[in-house]
Amino acid sequence: YHNIFGPEGTWFGGREKAPAAICRKVAYAEDTDTIEVWGDGKQTRSFLFIDECIEATRRMMDSDFIGPVNIGSEEMVTINQLVDTAAKVAGKKIDKKHIDGPLGVRGRNSNNDLIRKELGWDYSMTLEEGIRRTYNWIMREIAKDVMEGEVVEPVGTI
C-alpha cells in the first residue's frame, strides 16, 4: 500500500499522513496565511484515496492471483503541489515557509503494472478530488470539536 489517505483517518497529533496534516493546517489557516513545510517541499510522493485502496484489496481477495502487488496511485506530486491542491480546494491562497525537518526519501511512487494486468484494477480518483473529500471531512470534524468544546490545536509541520 502506498500512502493511503482519506476521511476517518488520523488527522492530528503527529501520526497523520501528509494529506491529512496539510488539510488540517489549511483548514486552520486564514486566507493568505503561511504554513510550515519540511525541507524545500520538492520531495515527491503518490497518494491513494482510501476507497480506491478498498476496491483494489477487494479485487485481490476475490481473485485467484497469488503474489505481491502494489496498490497505490501513479500520480506523483511534490509536497508543495499537495499544499497548493489543499489550498485550492479550500478556496484560500496559502504561502509556504520551508523549514528544516525530516524529509524521508526524495521520491516514491507506485508501479501498478502487475495489479493492472492481473486484476484489471487501476485508480481513477484524482488527487484533487481525494483532497476535497478529506478536507471537507476534516472541516466537519473541526466544527464538531468546536461544538463539543474540544478544539484541536493546529500544531506541527509537514
Model-identified regions with their sequence ranges:
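Active-site Tyr-X1-5-Lys
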Residues: 1, 21-31
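Flexible, glycine-rich beta-alpha linker
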Residues: 1-20, 44
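A general structural signal for well-ordered alpha-helical packing
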Residues: 19, 23, 54-57
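C-terminal substrate-binding subdomain of Rossmann-fold SDR/epimerase-dehydratase oxidoreductases
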Residues: 28-158
